[in-house]
Regions:
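Catalytic cores of processing enzymes, dominated by hydrolases/peptidases
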Residues: 1-105
Length: 106
């Protein structure tokens, strides 16, 4: 927790066992979650925002332990990690985070 103590928003990345290339997004930051989901969907990725087993809504979830007490988590399937869509996930995530950091820079 010391690592994220000075972070306003935390983005946690986890993996789960599944043979389909997909991403499940969770966390309490609904705006960021939908923004990330929109970017991933535009890139052609299979992304789930709701009604999945990893919503990341508990206040003690690592993604919700930053200064703003809300963040997002990316749950990446086994098939996605190391699969053909992995670079697209990385690019989509970086794109959104870069835009956010530019919006926060005076």
């Amino acid at each position: 927790l010391n690592l994220i103590a000075d972070c306003a928003v935390v983005v946690a990345i986890h993996g789960y066992s599944w043979e389909i290339q997909e991403t499940m997004l969770g966390g309490l930051d609904e705006k960021l979650k939908h923004r990330m989901g929109r970017q991933m969907a535009l890139a052609g990725l299979d992304v789930k925002l709701d009604n999945h087993p990893y919503p990341g809504l508990h206040e003690n979830n690592i993604c919700n332990r930053g200064q703003l007490e809300q963040g997002i988590q990316l749950e990446l399937s086994d098939a996605l990690r190391g699969g053909s869509d992995e670079p697209t996930v990385i690019q989509s995530t970086r794109s959104v985070l870069l835009k956010i950091s530019q919006e926060c820079t005076p």
